[in-house]
């Protein structure tokens, strides 16, 4: 989702724009599409909507970004003065975000000596509830925004293992997403805007479809019980909104992400048919299009330290492994540290 409020974006515009809106005080949506208002407000709203949907697709793509269930600011105990390492704003943002992803992948019966096919799908839910301070010098009351996104993704793909230690994967998928935005006007000044903004900028819902193809190349080397793995994956997103005849809600989505990750797994031991290993990982993620705008950076880095547990016979056929560990995001709007939990790690 776009990681800053649309109302903050409007508040940051020139003072003459705010004054003109107050003077207009029109109770219809036409106020948002006449004259200079069209040039000022509509592009902001459309970019924010496109960024919101693109960021949500990235959030529920487990190979691109992970949001932890406990977040912290590593700059509090790492003696490095670097704004890209973390901060109070990033930590507060991650605590405001709540996500649930329910994925499932099944092998298909069509396969050959060096290739196999599969289908995968996932249901996703994202929410951000937060307070917004506007015109504090006139009224300290805070507005409240609730943003919810529901998604369903389905894809089919092929693995090709024709070269020793190498795997190539091609996948074609698509998703449907629904955004619901609720905005409570508590501030006396912001209430002036409510007749103009409701249904367009605030208190509305919107649907989109997205095509999401991806290509991945993986190298894996094992010796003894150690494992070294490199994985490179490029994912593209293209989509449009549908079901709305309001011009600001007619949105095109174009974005991509390219993740390169190096993993090293070191065996620890085995207990009750469960294998334990420590895993180190380092990633660089390059973003373009609407994802670049949403994360406010063209690229960021992730560093992970995990305890990986193979499930053995306990999860045969559906659960290969689970892991718990620390993840550090460097350079994006989600910078900082997190305690994370994953399963079926690649």
Residue ranges and their predicted role:
Residues 104-110, 156-162, 215-221, 266-270, ...:
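Residue-level signature of outer-membrane beta-barrel architecture
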Residues 85-109, 116-118, 124-126:
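Long, compositionally biased low-complexity segments
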Residues 35-43, 109-257, 263, 282, ...:
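Outer-membrane pore/translocation modules
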Residues 240-346:
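Outer membrane beta-barrel transmembrane domains
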Residues 66-97, 129-147:
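Surface-exposed strand-loop-strand hairpins of Gram-negative outer-membrane beta-barrel proteins
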Residues 66-75, 111-122, 167-171, 227-231, ...:
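Residue-level detector of the transmembrane beta-barrel scaffold of outer-membrane proteins
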Residues 61-66, 225-227, 266-275:
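Short N-terminal helix-initiation segments at or just after the protein's N-terminus
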Residues 1-86, 111-115:
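Cleavable N-terminal export/targeting peptides
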């Amino acid at each position: 989702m776009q990681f800053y409020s649309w109302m903050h974006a409007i508040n940051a515009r020139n003072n003459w724009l705010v004054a003109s809106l107050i003077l207009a005080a029109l109770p219809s949506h036409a106020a948002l599409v006449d004259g200079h208002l069209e040039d000022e407000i509509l592009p902001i709203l459309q970019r924010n909507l496109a960024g919101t949907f693109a960021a949500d697709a990235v959030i529920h793509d487990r190979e691109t970004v992970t949001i932890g269930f406990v977040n912290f600011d590593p700059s509090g105990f790492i003696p490095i003065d670097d704004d890209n390492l973390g901060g109070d704003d990033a930590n507060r943002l991650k605590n405001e975000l709540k996500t649930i992803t329910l994925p499932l992948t099944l092998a298909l019966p069509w396969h050959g000596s060096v290739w196999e096919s599969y289908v995968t799908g996932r249901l996703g839910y994202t929410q951000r509830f937060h307070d917004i301070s506007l015109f504090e010098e006139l009224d300290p009351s805070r507005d409240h925004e609730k943003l919810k996104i529901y998604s369903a993704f389905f894809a089919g793909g092929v693995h090709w293992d024709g070269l020793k230690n190498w795997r190539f994967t091609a996948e074609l998928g698509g998703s449907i997403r629904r955004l619901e935005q609720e905005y409570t006007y508590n501030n006396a000044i912001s209430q002036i805007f409510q007749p103009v903004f409701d249904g367009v900028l605030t208190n509305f819902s919107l649907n989109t479809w997205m095509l999401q193809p991806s290509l991945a190349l993986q190298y894996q080397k094992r010796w003894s019980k150690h494992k070294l793995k490199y994985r490179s994956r490029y994912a593209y997103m293209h989509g449009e909104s549908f079901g709305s005849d309001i011009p600001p809600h007619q949105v095109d989505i174009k974005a991509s992400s390219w993740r390169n990750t190096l993993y090293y797994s070191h065996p620890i031991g085995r207990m009750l048919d469960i294998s334990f290993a420590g895993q180190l990982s380092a990633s660089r993620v390059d973003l373009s299009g609407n994802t670049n705008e949403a994360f406010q950076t063209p690229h960021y880095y992730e560093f992970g330290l995990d305890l990986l547990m193979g499930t053995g016979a306990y999860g045969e056929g559906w659960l290969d492994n689970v892991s718990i560990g620390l993840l550090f995001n460097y350079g994006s709007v989600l910078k900082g540290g997190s305690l994370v939990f994953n399963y079926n790690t690649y």
